[in-house]
C-alpha cells in the first residue's frame, strides 16, 4: 500500500470479507474512497454514472453488514453496480468497463459469484429475489436475499406483481427501495431515522407479532380496526409506507442513504430478523459527491469519457444526424400537418427522439414510464379512437410488450406505429440491449407492415409511410447512432407498400439488404467488382409485405443471392427463403445464402467489432459470396474501401 495512495483503505479490500474486518469509522473512509475511485474509473471508460455515485454508502453498508456472496445481493437494472464491482474483486479491471473483453456495464452471473442474478432490463430484482428466497427455504438455508431496486423501476407492473406474491407468502426477503428522485419520499430527518431504527428492531417486531397473535382471538371487526390503526399510525409517523404494508411488506423508512450511522443499524436489525418480507426505503441523491453530476443528474446519468476537473464530456465530431434526431424531427413535420399524430415513449424520451416531438407538441406526447406493456395497449386505445400513435421503443424493450403487440394491436389490426430504436447490435451495452430479435418476433405476425431504414433519408420517408397506414400496425426499425451523411429530403414521401429498390445493377451476384448493412454491401460490391464479379445491390425496404417480384427477379437473374440483415435467425432471410421455396426456386440452380447475427448472445464491444465478428461487414459479405461460389476468397488479403 503506497503512502501516496488516494485510496489507502480501499487498497486493502479485495473482497467484502476484507471490508467486514474494518471498524465502523473506517467504513466511512472506505465509502469516500470508493466514490473517488468510481469517479476516476468512469471518467476513463464512460458509462452509467449518476446512479452509482448515489449508492456508494448503501453499497458499502450492504457488503459490510451482509455476508455476500452467501447472502444474495441482486441489483435491479445494474446501472448503479460499478461501486459494487469495485468492492467485489473487480477493481483491477474496472477501467475495462463496457469495452471488448472487459467488464460488463451490468451485473452478470458469469462474471462474478457476487452477481447472483444478471440485470439490465428493469424491475426484475424482486421476482428473482423471491425465487431465491423460496429456494433457500425449500433447501433449509438461512442466508439472506436482498434486492435493491430504484424508484423508477419499482413503478413497473412486474415489481408490484412480485411484491404482491412475496407479501402473500410472508417470505423472508429484503427489498431496498433506492429512491433517488424524491418522488415518493418526504423530508428525511432525525425523527424519521430514529423511528426507522426503532421499528426495524427486534423489540418492536416481537410486540407487533404478539399483537397479531392476540388479534387472531379477537372479534374480526376489532382485530381489523386495531391492525389498521397500527398501520396508519406508523404511516403517519414514518411519512409513508402504507401501500407497501398493504402488499404485505414490513416498511422501514425513509432513511438517509448517505448516512452510515442510520443505514448500518437498520440493515443489521433487518438482517437478524426471522420474519419478512421487509422494504427499506432509502433516499439517495443521484451523482452524490461530484458537483457537476449533482447539478445536472439527467446529463450525468450516462456519460462518455469526461474531464474530472470540469465535468466536460468528450464529444466526437458529428458528420451526420443521428437516427433518433431524424425520427423526432420527421415526426414533428408530419404532426404539423396532422393533429391526430401523438408520440409515446416508455421512459426513453431523449433516447428515442420523442423529446424533440415533445418540445413541439407537449400535449400530444406521453411518457408512460417503465411500462412497455401499458405503452403498447395505451397506443392501441388511441388508435381505436382514430388517433395516430407513434410508439417509440427500443427493440430490446419491445420484447417486454410482445403479448400486447399480438393481442391488443395485431389481432385487431389497429394502426399503431412502432418506431423501433436500437435495432441491431448496440455495442457497449452488449447482449441485454441488442435489438436482435424484432425481425423474427414481428415477422411472424399477420397484419404487420415491417420496414427497415437503410439510411437517414429513408427513415424520413418511412415515417411518412407510417402516417399513411391506417388499416393495420406498422413498424420501422433503425439503429443507434449517426446516419451516413446522405442528402436529406425536405419532406417525407410515402413509399409504395411492399416494394424495394435496386441501388446498383449487376449480373452475377445479388446482395439483398434489409436495413443499414446496405453501406457494407456497397463496399463489398466494390471489392467484388475488382475481382471480376458484377454485383447487384438491392434495398428491400420492406420485410413484410415482402417484395416478391424483386426477390424472384434477383434469384432468376443472378448466380448467387445473398440476404443481409442486422437480426437473428428467423428474420428477413427466412422470409426470402420461404418465398423462394413456395415458388419452386430452390429446386433448381439458385444458390441462396443468408447473413444473420450468429445464434448466440454476443458480448459487448464496439458495434464495428461486433459486426465484423458476426460476418456482417463488407469483408464478411465477400467471404460468404466466395463460399457460395465454392472458391477461396483469401479474405486476409481483401482490401476494402
From Swiss-Prot:
<dbReference type="GO" id="GO:0019682">
    <property type="term" value="P:glyceraldehyde-3-phosphate metabolic process"/>
</dbReference>
<keyword id="KW-0808">Transferase</keyword>
<dbReference type="GO" id="GO:0052865">
    <property type="term" value="P:1-deoxy-D-xylulose 5-phosphate biosynthetic process"/>
</dbReference>
<comment type="similarity">
    <text>Belongs to the transketolase family. DXPS subfamily.</text>
</comment>
<comment type="pathway">
    <text>Metabolic intermediate biosynthesis; 1-deoxy-D-xylulose 5-phosphate biosynthesis; 1-deoxy-D-xylulose 5-phosphate from D-glyceraldehyde 3-phosphate and pyruvate: step 1/1.</text>
</comment>
<dbReference type="InterPro" id="IPR049557">
    <property type="entry name" value="Transketolase_CS"/>
</dbReference>
<dbReference type="InterPro" id="IPR033248">
    <property type="entry name" value="Transketolase_C"/>
</dbReference>
<feature type="binding site">
    <location>
        <position position="372"/>
    </location>
    <ligand>
        <name>thiamine diphosphate</name>
    </ligand>
</feature>
<dbReference type="Pfam" id="PF13292">
    <property type="entry name" value="DXP_synthase_N"/>
</dbReference>
<comment type="subunit">
    <text>Homodimer.</text>
</comment>
<feature type="binding site">
    <location>
        <position position="180"/>
    </location>
    <ligand>
        <name>thiamine diphosphate</name>
    </ligand>
</feature>
<dbReference type="InterPro" id="IPR005477">
    <property type="entry name" value="Dxylulose-5-P_synthase"/>
</dbReference>
<keyword id="KW-0784">Thiamine biosynthesis</keyword>
<keyword id="KW-0479">Metal-binding</keyword>
<feature type="binding site">
    <location>
        <position position="79"/>
    </location>
    <ligand>
        <name>thiamine diphosphate</name>
    </ligand>
</feature>
<keyword id="KW-0460">Magnesium</keyword>
<dbReference type="GO" id="GO:0030976">
    <property type="term" value="F:thiamine pyrophosphate binding"/>
</dbReference>
<feature type="binding site">
    <location>
        <position position="180"/>
    </location>
    <ligand>
        <name>Mg(2+)</name>
    </ligand>
</feature>
<dbReference type="Pfam" id="PF02779">
    <property type="entry name" value="Transket_pyr"/>
</dbReference>
<feature type="binding site">
    <location>
        <position position="290"/>
    </location>
    <ligand>
        <name>thiamine diphosphate</name>
    </ligand>
</feature>
<dbReference type="InterPro" id="IPR009014">
    <property type="entry name" value="Transketo_C/PFOR_II"/>
</dbReference>
<protein>
    <recommendedName>
        <fullName>1-deoxy-D-xylulose-5-phosphate synthase</fullName>
        <ecNumber>2.2.1.7</ecNumber>
    </recommendedName>
</protein>
<dbReference type="GO" id="GO:0009228">
    <property type="term" value="P:thiamine biosynthetic process"/>
</dbReference>
<keyword id="KW-0786">Thiamine pyrophosphate</keyword>
<dbReference type="InterPro" id="IPR020826">
    <property type="entry name" value="Transketolase_BS"/>
</dbReference>
<feature type="binding site">
    <location>
        <begin position="152"/>
        <end position="153"/>
    </location>
    <ligand>
        <name>thiamine diphosphate</name>
    </ligand>
</feature>
<dbReference type="Pfam" id="PF02780">
    <property type="entry name" value="Transketolase_C"/>
</dbReference>
<dbReference type="GO" id="GO:0000287">
    <property type="term" value="F:magnesium ion binding"/>
</dbReference>
<keyword id="KW-0414">Isoprene biosynthesis</keyword>
<dbReference type="GO" id="GO:0008661">
    <property type="term" value="F:1-deoxy-D-xylulose-5-phosphate synthase activity"/>
</dbReference>
<dbReference type="GO" id="GO:0016114">
    <property type="term" value="P:terpenoid biosynthetic process"/>
</dbReference>
<dbReference type="InterPro" id="IPR005475">
    <property type="entry name" value="Transketolase-like_Pyr-bd"/>
</dbReference>
<dbReference type="InterPro" id="IPR029061">
    <property type="entry name" value="THDP-binding"/>
</dbReference>
<comment type="function">
    <text>Catalyzes the acyloin condensation reaction between C atoms 2 and 3 of pyruvate and glyceraldehyde 3-phosphate to yield 1-deoxy-D-xylulose-5-phosphate (DXP).</text>
</comment>
<feature type="binding site">
    <location>
        <begin position="120"/>
        <end position="122"/>
    </location>
    <ligand>
        <name>thiamine diphosphate</name>
    </ligand>
</feature>
<feature type="binding site">
    <location>
        <position position="151"/>
    </location>
    <ligand>
        <name>Mg(2+)</name>
    </ligand>
</feature>
Amino acid at each position: 500500500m503506497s503512502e501516496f495512495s488516494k485510496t489507502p483503505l480501499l487498497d486493502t479490500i479485495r473482497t467484502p470479507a476484507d471490508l467486514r474486518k474494518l471498524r465502523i469509522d473506517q467504513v466511512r473512509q472506505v465509502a469516500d474512497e470508493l466514490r473517488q475511485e468510481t469517479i476516476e474509473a468512469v471518467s476513463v471508460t464512460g458509462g452509467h454514472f449518476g446512479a452509482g455515485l448515489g449508492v456508494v454508502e448503501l453499497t458499502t453498508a450492504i457488503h459490510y453488514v451482509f455476508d455476500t456472496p452467501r447472502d444474495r445481493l441482486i441489483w435491479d437494472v445494474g446501472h448503479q453496480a460499478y461501486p459494487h464491482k469495485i468492492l467485489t474483486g473487480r477493481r483491477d479491471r474496472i477501467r475495462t468497463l463496457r469495452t471488448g473483453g472487459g467488464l460488463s456495464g451490468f451485473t452478470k452471473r458469469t462474471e462474478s459469484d457476487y452477481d447472483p442474478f444478471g440485470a439490465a432490463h428493469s424491475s426484475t430484482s424482486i421476482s428473482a429475489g423471491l425465487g431465491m428466497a423460496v429456494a433457500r427455504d425449500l433447501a433449509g438455508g438461512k442466508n439472506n436475499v436482498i434486492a435493491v431496486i430504484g424508484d423508477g423501476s419499482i413503478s413497473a407492473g412486474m415489481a408490484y406483481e412480485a411484491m404482491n406474491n412475496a407479501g402473500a407468502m410472508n417470505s423472508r426477503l429484503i427489498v431496498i427501495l433506492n429512491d433517488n428522485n424524491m418522488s415518493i419520499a418526504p423530508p428525511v430527518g432525525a425523527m424519521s431515522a430514529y423511528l426507522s431504527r426503532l421499528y426495524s428492531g427486534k423489540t418492536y417486531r416481537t410486540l407487533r407479532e404478539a399483537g397479531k397473535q392476540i388479534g387472531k382471538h379477537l372479534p374480526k371487526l376489532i382485530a381489523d380496526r386495531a391492525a389498521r390503526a397500527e398501520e396508519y399510525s406508523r404511516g403517519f409517523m414514518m411519512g409513508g409506507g402504507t401501500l407497501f404494508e398493504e402488499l404485505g411488506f414490513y416498511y422501514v423508512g425513509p432513511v438517509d442513504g448517505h448516512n452510515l450511522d442510520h443505514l448500518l443499524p437498520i440493515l443489521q436489525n433487518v438482517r437478524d430478523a426471522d420474519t419478512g418480507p421487509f422494504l427499506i426505503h432509502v433516499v439517495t441523491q443521484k451523482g452524490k459527491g461530484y458537483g457537476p453530476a449533482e447539478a445536472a443528474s439527467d446529463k450525468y446519468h450516462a456519460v462518455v469519457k469526461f474531464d474530472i476537473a470540469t465535468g466536460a464530456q468528450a464529444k466526437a465530431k458529428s458528420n451526420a444526424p443521428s437516427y433518433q434526431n431524424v425520427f423526432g424531427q420527421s415526426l414533428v413535420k408530419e404532426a404539423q400537418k396532422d393533429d391526430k399524430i401523438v408520440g409515446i415513449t416508455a421512459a426513453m424520451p431523449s433516447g428515442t427522439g420523442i423529446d424533440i416531438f415533445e418540445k413541439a407538441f407537449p400535449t400530444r406526447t406521453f411518457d408512460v414510464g417503465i411500462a412497455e406493456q401499458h405503452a403498447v395497449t395505451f397506443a392501441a386505445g388511441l388508435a381505436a379512437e382514430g388517433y395516430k400513435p407513434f410508439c417509440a421503443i427500443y427493440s430490446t424493450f419491445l420484447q417486454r410488450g410482445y403479448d400486447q403487440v399480438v393481442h391488443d394491436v395485431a389481432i385487431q389490426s389497429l394502426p399503431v406505429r412502432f418506431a423501433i430504436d436500437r435495432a441491431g447490435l448496440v455495442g457497449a451495452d452488449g447482449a441485454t440491449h441488442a435489438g436482435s430479435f424484432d425481425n423474427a418476433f414481428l415477422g411472424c405476425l399477420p397484419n404487420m407492415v415491417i420496414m427497415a431504414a437503410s439510411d437517414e433519408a429513408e427513415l424520413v420517408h418511412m415515417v411518412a409511410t407510417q402516417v399513411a397506414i391506417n388499416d393495420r400496425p406498422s413498424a420501422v426499425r433503425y439503429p443507434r447512432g449517426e446516419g451516413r451523411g446522405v442528402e436529406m429530403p425536405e419532406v417525407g414521401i410515402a413509399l409504395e407498400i411492399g416494394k424495394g429498390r435496386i441501388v446498383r445493377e449487376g449480373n452475377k451476384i445479388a446482395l439483398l439488404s434489409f436495413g443499414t448493412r446496405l453501406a457494407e454491401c456497397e463496399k463489398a460490391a466494390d471489392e467484388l467488382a475488382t475481382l471480376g464479379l458484377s454485383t447487384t445491390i438491392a434495398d428491400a425496404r420492406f420485410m413484410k409485405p415482402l417484395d416478391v417480384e424483386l426477390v424472384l427477379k434477383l434469384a432468376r437473374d443472378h448466380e448467387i443471392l445473398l440476404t443481409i440483415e442486422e437480426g437473428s435467425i428467423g428474420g428477413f432471410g427466412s422470409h426470402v427463403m420461404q418465398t423462394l421455396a413456395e415458388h419452386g426456386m430452390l429446386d433448381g440452380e439458385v444458390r441462396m445464402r443468408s447473413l444473420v447475427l450468429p445464434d448466440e448472445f454476443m458480448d459487448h464491444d464496439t458495434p464495428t467489432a461486433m459486426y465484423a465478428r458476426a460476418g456482417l461487414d463488407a469483408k464478411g459479405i465477400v467471404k460468404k459470396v466466395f463460399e457460395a461460389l465454392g472458391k477461396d476468397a483469401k479474405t486476409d488479403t481483401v482490401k476494402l474501401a
